[in-house]
Amino acid sequence: MNKKANPGLKIICLNRKASFNFFFEDLIEAGIVLKGSEIKSIRDGKVNIADSYAVEKDGEIVLINSHIAAFKQASYSNHNPTDERKLLLNKKEINKLIGKMQRDGFTLVPTKMYFKKGKAKIEIAVAKGKKQFDKRATKKNRDWNREKARHIRKSS
């Protein structure tokens, strides 16, 4: 009985750097406006969201600096790999995010991209940047947890 945790979800890309560099306050799922060649590249797994972030532009949330590789089989109508991509959110969600960004100094960082029921989705974290000492503490805790797990395995 090998069942997946979430059968309708196929994760394409993770942003592991985000959890190291930021404190997450809230996670929001958003759709992405894509062209045909972009969706085919995403299905091939040729996506990088490690250095990307989202900003407000003309009352919309836009994903910047995400890299979706050009699709080889697309001829003249291929897309630009580093285009800005509009995120699909409700007006209420957009206003909430804009308020947090302006008032509280939060930033919007993508944490993962996945397919849900055949549609490409992206998980955006409302996050605040970590200082250098916070990053050191995170690394220290991670190393300590690894060491504890090793000791437990040895003693068993």
From Swiss-Prot:
Region (Disordered): 133-156
Species whose genome carries this gene: Pelagibacter ubique (strain HTCC1062)
Gene3D superfamilies, sorted: 2.40.280.10
Family: Belongs to the SmpB family.
InterPro entries recorded: SmpB, SsrA-bd_prot, SsrA-bd_prot_CS
Localization of this protein: Cytoplasm
Sequence ranges of Basic and acidic residues compositional bias: 133-147
Entry keyword set: Cytoplasm, RNA-binding
Name of protein: SsrA-binding protein
Gene Ontology CC: cytosol
